[in-house]
Regions:
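Conserved N-terminal catalytic/coupling substructures associated with nucleotide/phosphate chemistry
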Residues: 2-209
Length: 209
């Protein structure tokens, strides 16, 4: 049976945008950077966001990418327009602080800037946020957990989050206590039968030495 994370990722593994395509757009001639990034399709590994996006909203997507396969968010592009970031320079530090301020444990990201020509024809820049895939499940400081699924960052229900933890080896299904059940609910006879082979094996081991 495929796990929840496996089903989601396999369903969207048809080739859309690759990391190489994003890299090629980011390293294109200055006047082409914005247009090439706008032409790319948002997918499992790539997203575009406005420089007007609030840090807490960007945090949802950062957590989602981290809980999946990682990816890149380019900030300064919105609705087919190359906004750039030069008119909002005060937001750069806020973006850099997102992992510490809004994610638990802090997501590992790399924040950089790339030059471009904005839609007004002026020299400008974009912010790139590169998110590494995580080995454990990340969440927002309010406890919400997100997963990147295709071109969406989906909020997970409790059971979906538990499945994600199983997939990442962060939790074991047979190690979860059942609510309302304690040792007094165990069938003594079944418990004895379960333990009998263990005792027998132990006896054979010591008898053979």
């Amino acid at each position: 049976m495929l796990s929840l994370l496996g089903i989601y990722l396999k369903a969207f593994r048809v080739v859309f945008v690759t990391a190489n395509e994003v890299d090629r757009a980011l390293t294109a001639p200055l006047k082409e950077v914005g247009a090439k990034l706008l032409a790319l399709r948002e997918d499992q590994w790539f997203d575009r966001k406005s420089i007007r996006s609030q840090p807490k909203d960007l945090a949802q997507h950062i957590v989602a990418f981290s809980n999946a396969e990682g990816g890149t968010i380019v900030v300064g592009l919105h609705d087919g327009v190359v906004e750039g970031i030069d008119q909002h320079g005060e937001k750069i530090n806020s973006i850099r602080q997102i992992p510490i301020d809004f994610t638990v444990p802090p997501v590992r990201v790399h924040v950089d800037q790339v030059g471009c020509i904005n839609s007004k024809g002026e020299p400008d820049a974009l912010v790139t946020i590169t998110i590494d895939p995580s080995e454990s499940v990340h969440e927002l400081t309010n406890g919400d957990c997100y997963l990147r699924v295709g071109d969406e960052s989906r909020k997970l229900r409790h059971d979906q989050r538990r499945e994600l933890e199983f997939d990442k080896g962060q939790a074991q299904y047979d190690g979860i206590a059942l609510a309302g059940v304690d040792v007094n609910d165990l069938d003594p006879e079944l418990t004895r039968q379960y333990r009998e082979p263990e005792r027998s094996n132990g006896f054979q081991y010591f008898a053979g030495r």
